[in-house]
Design a protein with these regions (language model features):
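Non-catalytic DNA-recognition/assembly elements of restriction-modification systems
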Residues: 1-21, 155-210
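A short glycine-rich beta-alpha junction/loop motif
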Residues: 19, 100-108, 140-170
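A short beta-sheet element
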Residues: 34-35, 60-128
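Short, well-ordered beta-strand elements within core beta-sheets of diverse protein domains
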Residues: 58-62, 108-114, 155-160, 174, ...
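Short, positively charged
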Residues: 121-152
Length: 210
């Protein structure tokens, strides 16, 4: 049987570390998940071993709290944005090798404390659903910059199916996600090929004119 739970009873919420881009590097001691990079290269999850775009680093000298460090299967949650539509993006952090990583400014780490009740991957999909995002928007504050406080998120009640049902749902959605990602990459390759081919044709045309 499933159950109804309040998010605050099964998850913890921690603010990310505020570190400017000027102190980010191509190599370093900690992977750093910057808020601005999430919208430009990631969708639903961050795979540390095969990221859809390079993940920057920060150095060990930065002042980072233990609560700001990411663990495998944490959810990187965006609760601050310049538009309401961008609020509530959730990214599952897949880090099976447990590489040192820090969640960045304007992000919140959602960590599942009760894995006997919810699989992190299932919760990530649930938090990305239109129904949940609609509930989240009830708590939006601000005029120019919009925010939802983690304390408000922790009060949201969700209904969870049995763990085995969650595993089946995650398996199906992961399969769809993987196929979608492959198609996106393929479309990107085709677009680059078309641009190159069009440029070649144009050059040949110009040469023939001369």
């Amino acid at each position: 049987m499933g159950c109804k739970v309040v998010l605050g009873d099964i998850c913890s919420f921690s603010r990310g570390a505020s570190i400017p881009r000027a102190r980010m590097h191509d190599t370093g001691d900690y992977l750093y998940i910057h808020y601005g990079d999430l919208y430009k290269g990631f969708d639903l999850r961050i795979d540390v071993e095969s990221p859809s775009k390079p993940i920057p680093f920060i150095l060990r000298g930065e002042k980072v709290k233990e609560s700001q460090c990411l663990k495998d299967q944490d959810i990187v949650y965006v609760l601050t944005s310049e538009t309401v539509d961008d609020l509530g993006h959730a990214y599952l952090f897949n880090n099976p090798q447990n590489k040192l990583a820090v969640s960045g400014t304007e992000t919140t780490i959602v960590r599942v404390k009760r894995r006997d009740l919810v699989i992190p991957a299932y919760l990530n999909y649930l938090m990305s659903s239109p129904c949940f995002i609609g509930e989240l928007r009830r708590y939006v504050r601000g005029m120019k910059v919009f925010r939802v406080h983690p304390a408000d998120v922790s009060r949201i009640e969700i209904e969870l199916p049995h763990i085995e049902t969650q595993r089946k749902v995650v398996s199906i959605l992961d399969s769809i996600y993987t196929k979608q990602r492959i198609n996106t990459q393929l479309n990107g390759y085709l677009l680059e090929y078309l641009k190159t081919y069009a440029k070649t044709l144009y050059c040949e045309y110009e040469n023939d004119k001369n």
